[in-house]
Every structure is written in structure tokens, then in C-alpha cells.
């Protein structure tokens, strides 16, 4: 049987600003062509909208509170994946698969992510990336070993200048500079329409078009090497666009992202089922290892969607996803969790008394400067009041059919108490199953106090206590049942 290879292409800070996702402004012919040849997912979700954390979920099949990559990778602060985690590169190597990574890595330590072949770089030169892939393919041609190659692009991430996206950096002459006019840009609903936002979106679109050319270059090299006929191609992004209301938030603009998969010999289709980034590694293992993947997948939170890849109907078993964010930068502590169904989204903001923190690149942006200095009152980011962006309540509940921008919080709505209680319970059950240290009762981590549960002691729910009137007996609130931790089984 021919080797079953994988080419995993990961963009940096890319939302759905692509032609194949209905954006009429940004020119992305190569990505659009890939979508026309494969499956375009409309409901693919990152677990966290932060670079290192999101990439770690892709490469481990575990949420960040499970794998330890709580925030941006940093040896100085030891913000790294737990040493005991077996990542995709390690699991694949056990089965003789050649693994490689080109470009942005941004996870660690190296011992946990033992890619056999590395060409690490933050270059914007997508031709360079394609040539490194060519070298990798040539090595695979010589010995015939199956491979899983990951390419981490740096586009369309911001650069270190105000409003810049790396468009002035030197690149190969084969890369065309695709310019956009700010006055022509399409401002997404999650952003405010300001001159600074338009200027940055035009620069952002140029970086996306450069990324698109890189996708074309590398797919050509795959074809020339003769591997296109037996390689599963996966195109995705780590998190949403680097703007407020998106990156570092768990609102849909930050976590509902492009995912395109081309399976050899299959027709194009659109899949509307809800899949999570923790499902990517199980799917890769399924494709690359076949039956041998069963043992490796047992330790993962995700599940393979290979069998439902071409499903055009909404399936009951694929109707929700969970998400987990704790840090972005090491000083950006704001732990929050979510569950999203087809219609509703529930956020549990664990450290809700803290102001929502800024990522450095977003704080220095022209978009934020325009919003901060705007004369309108109240100030807004898109449809959201600025104060509601900074100061968030313990819980948020949104009806996405009627409120896709997640602005009108229904937590106190009498008509939505049943769905609130259901989603609250499902989220907490998931936190228990995944051993989440940030599941709290009265300010105490349940996981860290598991010995109390094991001893038969009751751990009260903070929702049983009226913090403004602690003398009140909340006997009308049923006690939450003590579930065991780490239950293996279905996502729900």
C-alpha cells in the first residue's frame, strides 16, 4: 500500500478573510482552489485564540489546561508543554513516520516536540518555505518513508511596527506584492470602521495574499515530487485576526477559523459539523497510521473526523465544541472556558474581576488608537461597548442565531435559564473529565482539593452562595453532584 502522507499548513493570525469563505476583498486564488478540491469546514474551532496554546492543541490533541502550554512559549518563564506529554511528532516517530516542521514553531520544549527535520524561521519569504519543503520531499523520495510535514507561516501576523504586517520585509522576487486600498476594504462586523482600522486591514490583506502565494508554491512542489496523489493536505490558522474582539478572546471572531482539507481522490464539499482543533491530531493519526492509530489516540481529548470528512448533513454527535484559554503573554492572565453548540455559546470567565488584558501588538495598533480617541459615547469596538470588552461578568450566554457578534448577554434572561443551566453543567462536566485545575468552588480549585471529595466531604458550589447576602440560605439551588475526574469517553 502506498504511504499515506500529511501536509499540514498553519497560518498565523488568519481569520476567514478568504475568497472561499465569502470575502470579496482579499485575493486568495490558491487557497480558494484548494477549497474547490477539498472539504471546507464552516464550523472549525480553535480551543484558544493564542498562538502557542492553539498550536499545542493541534500538535498534542489536548487542551492547554491538559498539556501545560498555558500561554506563549517561553523558556524564561517555562511556559512550555509538560515534559510527559507525547505529542504528534513523538507518536508518529514510534511508527516510522518522518516528521518535519518548517517556519514558525512557537511550542516547546524540543524534547516534547521531536520533529525529525527542522527548518525553523519567522521569515515572510514564502518561496524560501517552499524550497525547504522541496528538500524534505526529496529526502522522502529517496527512502519511501511516509511523512507528516508541518509548515508554520508567519503571515499574516503583525510585525513590530505600528500598523505593519511585514510587507516591507525582503522576500524572493517571485513573490508579488498585492496592494489594497484602505477605502476599498471590507471592515468585519467585529471591528469599528475607522481610518486606522482600514489602513491596517489593507496591510493585513496584503500579508494574506503573500501567504496565499506560499500555499500555491508549496502545493506545486508537492505535485512535482509526486506526492499529491497520496497526501492529505490540511490548511488552517492558529487563531483569529490580530484585532480587538478577536485574537486572545474566545468570541467567534477569535476561534471560528478556516479549515480546508483535501483528501486524494475525493470531491469537494462543505462540512457544517462542529470540529475542534484537538481533533486534528487524531485525524492525522487515523490517516497516516490506519488501525495502528487506535492505541495512540487513547490518550487524546480529540477524536478523528476522518470518517465524517465528507458528511454534508448536520450530525448529532458533532454538534458542540469546548474551549480553554488561560494566558496569552505571561502577564496576560485571564482564564476562561466555553462551550459552543450550533445555536448557543456559554462562556465561564474564571477571573472575571480582572480587567481583560491586551496583547502587546493589539495595544500598539492604529485600530485601538482610533477607538480609544473616538469622540462617540459610549465608545465601541464593533457592536460591543468598550467597557463590556474590558469588564466582563462571571458568565456570558449568547443566542448566535440572533446575536452572532455575542453582544447581548442572556444570563439574566428568564427565558434562557434552562439552556444556561444545561450549558453550565455540560461545561463543568467537561472540566472534570479533562482534569481542569481552573474548575473552582468558593475560590478553591476542585482538582487540587480532590482529596476532600475522595474523603466523602462535600465541596460547595459558588453558585449556591449569594456573595452580596451570604446570610441567605440558597436551599432552592440543587447541590451539584460530585463527578469523578478524568472520565474517558465521548466528548460530552
Predicted regions and their residues:
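Formylglycine-dependent sulfatase
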Residues: 1-396, 404-425, 438-439, 454-492
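Short, charged, surface-exposed hinge/linker loops at domain edges
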Residues: 439-453
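A contiguous binding-surface segment within folded domains or other stable secondary-structure elements
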Residues: 399
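Beta-rich accessory regions
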Residues: 424, 429-432
Amino acid at each position: 500500500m502506498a504511504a499515506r502522507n500529511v501536509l499540514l499548513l498553519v497560518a498565523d493570525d488568519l481569520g476567514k478573510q478568504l475568497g472561499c469563505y465569502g470575502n470579496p476583498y482579499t485575493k486568495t486564488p490558491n487557497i480558494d482552489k484548494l477549497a474547490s478540491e477539498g472539504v471546507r469546514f464552516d464550523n472549525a474551532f480553535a480551543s484558544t485564540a493564542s498562538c502557542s496554546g492553539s498550536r499545542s492543541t493541534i500538535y498534542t490533541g489536548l487542551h492547554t489546561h491538559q498539556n501545560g502550554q498555558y500561554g506563549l512559549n517561553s523558556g524564561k518563564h517555562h511556559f512550555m508543554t509538560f515534559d510527559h506529554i507525547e505529542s504528534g511528532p513523538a507518536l508518529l516517530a514510534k511508527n516510522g513516520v518522518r516528521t518535519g516542521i518548517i517556519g514558525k514553531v512557537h511550542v516547546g520544549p524540543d524534547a516534547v516536540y521531536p520533529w525529525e527535520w527542522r527548518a525553523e524561521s519567522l521569515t515572510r519569504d514564502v518561496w524560501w518555505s517552499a524550497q525547504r519543503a522541496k528538500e524534505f520531499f526529496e529526502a522522502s523520495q529517496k527512502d519511501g518513508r511516509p511523512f507528516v510535514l508541518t509548515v508554520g507561516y508567519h503571515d499574516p501576523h503583525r510585525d513590530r511596527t505600528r500598523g505593519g504586517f511585514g510587507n516591507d520585509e525582503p522576500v524572493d522576487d517571485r513573490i508579488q506584492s498585492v496592494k489594497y486600498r484602505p477605502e476599498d476594504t471590507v471592515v468585519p462586523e467585529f471591528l469599528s470602521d475607522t481610518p486606522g482600522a482600514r489602513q491596517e486591514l489593507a496591510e493585513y490583506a496584503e500579508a494574506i495574499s503573500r501567504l496565499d502565494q506560499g500555499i500555491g508554491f508549496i502545493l506545486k512542489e508537492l505535485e512535482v515530487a509526486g506526492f499529491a496523489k497520496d497526501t492529505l493536505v490540511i490548511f488552517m490558522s492558529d487563531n483569529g485576526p490580530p484585532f480587538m474582539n478577536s485574537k486572545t478572546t474566545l468570541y467567534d471572531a477569535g476561534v471560528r477559523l478556516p479549515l480546508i482539507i483535501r483528501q486524494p481522490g475525493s470531491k469537494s464539499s462543505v462540512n457544517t459539523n462542529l470540529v475542534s482543533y484537538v481533533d486534528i491530531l487524531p485525524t492525522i493519526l487515523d490517516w497516516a497510521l490506519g488501525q495502528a492509530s487506535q492505541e495512540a489516540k487513547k490518550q487524546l481529548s480529540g477524536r478523528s473526523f476522518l470518517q465524517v470528512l465528507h458528511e454534508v448533513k448536520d450530525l448529532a454527535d458533532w454538534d458542540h465544541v469546548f474551549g480553554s484559554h488561560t494566558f496569552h503573554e505571561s502577564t496576560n492572565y485571564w482564564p476562561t472556558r466555553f462551550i459552543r453548540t450550533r445555536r448557543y455559546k456559554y462562556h465561564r470567565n474564571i477571573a472575571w474581576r480582572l480587567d481583560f488584558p491586551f496583547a502587546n501588538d493589539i495595544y500598539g495598533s492604529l485600530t485601538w488608537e482610533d477607538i480609544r480617541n473616538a469622540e462617540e459615547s459610549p465608545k465601541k469596538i464593533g457592536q460591543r461597548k468598550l467597557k463590556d470588552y474590558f469588564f466582563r461578568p462571571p458568565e456570558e450566554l449568547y443566542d448566535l442565531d440572533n446575536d452572532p457578534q455575542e453582544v447581548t448577554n442572556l444570563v439574566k434572561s428568564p427565558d434562557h435559564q434552562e439552556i444556561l443551566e444545561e450549558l453550565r453543567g455540560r461545561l463543568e462536566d467537561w472540566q472534570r473529565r479533562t482534569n481542569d485545575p481552573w474548575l473552582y468552588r468558593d475560590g478553591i480549585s476542585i482538582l487540587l482539593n480532590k482529596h476532600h471529595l475522595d474523603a466523602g466531604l462535600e465541596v460547595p458550589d459558588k453558585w449556591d452562595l449569594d456573595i452580596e447576602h451570604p446570610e441567605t440560605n440558597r436551599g432552592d439551588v440543587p447541590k451539584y453532584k460530585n463527578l469523578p475526574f478524568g472520565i474517558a469517553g465521548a466528548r460530552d
